[in-house]
């Protein structure tokens, strides 16, 4: 994930960019994380498939979320250290009190196919990580670390006061951690709550997660993807770039409450997903939900996916509820309350990632049994599609500045659009055929005659004044 977590990482990035400026070459692969035992080598920057933006590093660090693939190398599982190590064995432990104080040392490490059951224990961590990549990708310096092993955790209290000290970290496709009744509090930077990489999995329930540092998402995945599945969570993050959820893998949250006072609600990067159900989450900075691709190598190229059902999402910033850049993305909403300070529902545009003039977005928003409000915008190299399905009602304008490369809308018979400003659509489809479920409110919706041959260039009067007319 892209945000650079430490001063060392900023220095490394600055050097890399200086080389790029003077030589035209970005020394990207020279500082990737080394693979941990049983894990693939860290991905290098990929060429995107046809139809997606070409990637190049921007002149600055990526935005809110997680840090990226510049910096020192990671370590193999055999090189990692901890106050307590279970190495290829099966153990059941209870009532431990462990305090790891040395740099790069975890409190508890299970590795090499080990299996541990740990209950009723307190683990704490001080002492910074010496390598951002090692802590971000292979879990160095985490409070509890599972590397290609299994762990069952219950009734634990985990605290850290160090940079690069994630709480529970699962790395490797053979790593699975189950956790129940866990309390987590991390105080410094790059110290997330639950974090998985390289196909690792965490399944957690009844978790209480507080993070205070920068780049400390409560629920996270990093390089090589990972899976984090959580039920019943209480989340509080306060640092810059520390959303409630940051995914370069697959993250599911059911029955959760949370606030990110220094960041967005949630971020998906690349071909990855966030699935929310019965949650109440609030973000305070920049946007509500961010869907993007940085091309740092941490997230595969493809469609970013976000869904929320039976939930409440509150965006306290003045930015859009959905911000999409440099990727193809889809969001699906059902019976979810959206609360926001600003007047923009969606903005699909170019940002600081990707290649100039090829770094727009392509976004589809699907809504069922849903109330939506706000304008939908896209720039001249971006496409946006709104699908209003049964019992979806939207009050807003589509492409009111007539800037989008494409702006499309479809409505089922039981959907409705309350138009708030003149709008310009590329294609429009409506099950009613007479567009009686579009309330014009005196505004004109212009459609592309060439892209809507079935409308034959006709003008249709809309309810409450206004019209649908060819352009």
Task: Label the predicted regions.
Residues 1-18:
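Bacterial Sec-dependent N-terminal signal peptides
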Residues 100-109:
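Transmembrane beta-barrel domains of bacterial outer-membrane proteins
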């Amino acid at each position: 994930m892209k945000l650079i977590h430490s001063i060392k990482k900023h220095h490394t990035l600055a050097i890399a960019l200086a080389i790029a400026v003077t030589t035209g070459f970005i020394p990207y692969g020279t500082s990737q994380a080394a693979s941990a035992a049983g894990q693939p080598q860290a991905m290098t920057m990929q060429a995107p498939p046809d139809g997606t933006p070409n990637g190049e590093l921007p002149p600055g660090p990526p935005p809110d979320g997680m840090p990226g693939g510049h910096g020192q190398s990671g370590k193999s599982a055999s090189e990692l250290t901890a106050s307590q190590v279970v190495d290829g064995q099966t153990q059941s432990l209870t009532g431990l009190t462990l305090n790891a104080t040395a740099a790069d040392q975890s409190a508890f490490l299970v590795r090499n196919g080990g299996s541990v059951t740990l209950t009723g224990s307190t683990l704490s961590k001080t002492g910074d990580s010496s390598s951002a990549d090692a802590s971000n990708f292979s879990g160095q310096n985490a409070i509890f670390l599972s590397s290609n092993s299994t762990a069952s955790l219950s009734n634990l209290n985990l605290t850290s006061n160090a940079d690069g000290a994630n709480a529970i970290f699962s790395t490797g496709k053979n790593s699975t951690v189950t956790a129940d009744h866990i309390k987590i509090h991390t105080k410094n930077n790059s110290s997330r709550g639950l974090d998985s990489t390289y196909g690792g999995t965490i399944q957690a329930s009844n978790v209480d997660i507080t993070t205070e540092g920068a780049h400390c998402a409560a629920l996270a995945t990093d390089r090589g993807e990972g899976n984090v599945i959580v039920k019943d969570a209480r989340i509080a993050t306060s640092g810059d770039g520390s959303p409630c959820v940051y995914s370069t893998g697959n993250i599911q949250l059911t029955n959760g409450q949370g606030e990110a006072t220094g960041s967005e609600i949630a971020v998906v990067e690349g071909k990855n997903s966030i699935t929310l159900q019965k949650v109440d989450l609030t973000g305070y900075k920049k946007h509500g939900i961010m869907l993007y691709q940085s091309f740092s190598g941490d997230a595969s190229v493809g469609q970013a996916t976000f869904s929320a059902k039976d939930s409440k999402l509150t965006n306290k910033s003045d930015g859009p509820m959905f911000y999409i850049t440099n990727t193809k993305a889809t969001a699906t909403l059902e019976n979810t309350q959206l609360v926001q300070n600003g007047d923009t529902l969606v903005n699909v545009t170019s940002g600081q990632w990707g290649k100039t003039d090829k770094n727009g977005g392509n976004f589809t928003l699907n809504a069922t049994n849903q109330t939506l409000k706000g304008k939908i915008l896209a720039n001249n190299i971006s496409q946006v599609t709104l699908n209003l399905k049964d019992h979806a009602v939207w009050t807003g304008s589509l492409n009111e500045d007539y800037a989008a490369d494409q702006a499309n809308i479809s409505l089922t018979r039981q959907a409705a659009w309350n138009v708030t400003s003149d709008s310009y659509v590329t294609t429009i489809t409506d099950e009613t055929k007479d567009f009686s479920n579009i309330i014009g409110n005196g505004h004109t919706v212009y459609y592309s005659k060439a892209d809507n041959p079935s409308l034959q260039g006709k003008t249709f009067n809309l309810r409450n004044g206004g019209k649908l007319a060819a352009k």
